[in-house]
């Protein structure tokens, strides 16, 4: 699978990574859209995004009180749909914490259309819930917590259109290896 991030660009707006990818499973096409929090500048290692003089040389579409992020995500979703995606799964590192506003997964969903599922991270939360998109449609949002405590499973029933999510505790997924004790 490719690394995807619709909102990671250089300062001229040129994408650093592909924003989306469409994969085919039988006769169903699924578009995957990558989204990273603009908080990456401050919550990771800032020097990764700076030149030798300390000037930022990248953007995460952080401007206009969230609108820049919503717009670039919408463009990637629309492009995936134009390529024939039957479903769009957003892969986000946005989170739901209030201090991450206006870039939370909830806000991205509320300001876009066309996303069916958003698999999220960043806030290390554990949940599966629905949020309304800009058109008032339900979008499943799920997070699996932190440090591989859980594995997430999302199922799209292509006959009914129902989308479900399940959390599975990692400890329940594999027996301990006798040789390593892990």
Name these PLM-found stretches.
Residues 1-176, 180:
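Acidic, metal/ion-coordinating pockets
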